[in-house]
Amino acid sequence: MANNNEIERRRTFAIIAHPDAGKTSLTEKLLLFGGQIQVAGAVKSNKIKKTATSDWMDIEKQRGISVTTSVMEFDYHDYKVNILDTPGHQDFAEDTYRTLTAVDGVIIVVDGAKGVETQTRKLMEVCRMRNTPVIIFINKMDREAKDPFDLLDELEEELHIHVRPLTWPIESGVRFKGVYNIYEHNLNLYQPSKQVVTEKVEVDIHTEELDNRIGAQLADKLRGELELIDGVYPEFDKEEYLKGELAPVFFGSALNNFGVQELLDCFVEIAPSPRPVKAEEREVEPEEPKFTGFIFKITANIDPNHRSCIAFCKICSGKFVRNAPYLHVRHGKTMRFSSPTQFMAQRKTTVDEAWAGDIIGLPDNGTFKIGDTLTEGEVLHFKGLPSFSPEMFKYIENADPMKQKQLAKGIDQLMDEGVAQLFVNQFNGRKIIGTVGQLQFEVIQYRLENEYSAKCRWEPLSLYKACWIESDDAAELEAFKKRKYQYMAKDREGRDVFLADSGYVLQMAQMDFKHIKFHFTSEF
């Protein structure tokens, strides 16, 4: 039986950003306020001063970037908060896309000096596709930043969404004095501190107390700007926000712990509790009494001391109970889970029960694939985001004949995670890895060596696109595969994939074989 109070208090969201906008720093500070950590690890200039809690994989600690989604949960006031800290690096966009299928809201971090960047636009497009509610945190206001009104204009123009500031900065850089909380009508004066929680000051902006706090000149400027905000921007409307049409905006400095508590306090109040999830068969409501959930991520070796996988399951409805029987829909088998876990980055604890909105980890020995569904018996298939055609391709070869088994296992597990895509060329039988960018090849090589004791080498392969093909005309499909036999491959699901080596070749193939459909995503 679903407990509506438990479901209502859940807040499950992702933090997304362009690389180096301060996303992991913000995650750390939210955990600090949530009481999960005592010291936040500063990620600065790609060097780790103290190890960031949410960057738990060795390669992340070395490089100072996030390369995989971390899942963390904590209680804050009367709410249960689940944070998914996603990779900011552009090469790991697919991991972020999949994560967005498992959240009910998103916080976008924007660098105050740089404004909206490429990756932010792409991620916002995915949020728009799913009507995901968005909150924007403009970070690094303690450094020289763009004019806040210019930033708001840029957000509206670039992200195609209406905005409403709920806090407002008093200057930036060396002149930065703090932020005024429009939502709660109080002043938060800036004290650079990576650990100390700054106190709020209740102040009426129309009295001399404001002048005494920040000086008459800045006080007059702040009053004028707040008046302009009320005249130009719409009042905050929670319904518009929940529909993904209005984004509240906050200003601060995550690294120096400033403006973060205002963001968190407002977020838990206005952010959505678990939302309905669409399955191919029907829409699933979170309050339904029966448990349903889907696997959105698989991580190998979350604990390097044990060669195990964890499948991350987003609970869509009802209540999950440890050791209860659940149907694995794709296999048609009943499974029980004796050690389901929840996370604080790499620290995990066994849970006896979890509710709609929660993310739980299930031990996986190869049973799960991304997109798998678990239910109490009903056959459901949740709709997710597909894999996209990779941008780069390389042959992967074994560099140590004695470690063939380890290499095969490592490739299988990493592909299950969705780090990259694997194709097998039907002409020569060689394995091809397809990725979004170069860094993924480095991560795969590093992890194969450090987690599986297997060595690989890469051989460049010049390809334009991987296209999944299908046709109602079996004869034409067979004729195409015969003509293009050198460029035909199979993906891990056994589907036919055409590896086009140029845009011209693809265009000619589409013209010559009009009854064949060429798809650039794996779901069609």
Language-model segments: residues:
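Structural and coupling elements of P-loop NTPases
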Residues: 1-524
